[in-house]
């Protein structure tokens, strides 16, 4: 979008403040671009869909309102990691899953050559939100 002005709702995340990339072993999740579909658990409404780029232990991704950065490790069909999620465009009039907070997320799950699943917990203000997600490989890197 030429000449478009974008404003961050919060201070932009700095990659230097994140945990270092994790180790990737045999049978670990593949580097590439994934679609991600997240569902909130514990009977709470909500979910989201977006994209996630996995590259040598580093996570980058987002959707229409949020972006996230993080790190992961993976081997033998398992993976785990952590991310920080932040709003990049105000979600006014929407019902965002994470409601305008900077969110810390921890997760673990399974993976194969085509994608992965995960269960995680997001810490949003004083709330802890459990979720599950499915990733499907769109393009290998």
Residue map of PLM features:
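Short, solvent-exposed coil/turn segments at beta-strand boundaries
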Residues: 29-33, 51-60, 74-78, 109-116, ...
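N-terminal glycine/threonine-rich, aromatic-flanked beta-hairpin/loop signature
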Residues: 44-86, 120-121, 125-127
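Contiguous, well-ordered beta-strand patches that form the walls/edges
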Residues: 2-3, 64-115
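Well-ordered beta-strand positions in beta-sheet-rich domains
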Residues: 49-51, 69, 104-108, 130-134
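Short, compact, well-ordered microdomains
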Residues: 112-136
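Short, solvent-exposed secondary-structure boundary motifs
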Residues: 35-44, 57-65, 96-102
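Residue-level signal for secondary-structure boundary sites
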Residues: 42-44, 89-91, 128, 141
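Tryptophan-anchored aromatic micro-motifs
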Residues: 2-44, 118
């Amino acid at each position: 979008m030429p000449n478009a002005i974008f404003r961050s709702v919060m201070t932009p995340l700095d990659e230097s403040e994140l945990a270092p990339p994790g180790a990737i072993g045999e049978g670990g999740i593949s580097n590439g671009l994934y679609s991600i579909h997240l569902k909130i658990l514990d009977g709470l409404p909500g979910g989201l869909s977006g994209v996630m780029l996995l590259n040598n232990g580093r996570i980058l991704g987002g959707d229409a309102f949020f972006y996230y950065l993080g790190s992961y490790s993976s081997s033998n069909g398992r993976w785990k990691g952590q991310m920080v999620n932040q709003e990049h465009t105000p979600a006014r009039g929407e019902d965002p899953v994470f409601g305008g907070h900077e969110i810390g997320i921890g997760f673990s799950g399974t993976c194969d050559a085509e994608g992965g699943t995960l269960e995680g917990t997001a810490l949003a203000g004083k709330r802890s939100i459990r979720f599950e997600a499915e990733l499907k490989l769109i393009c290998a890197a």
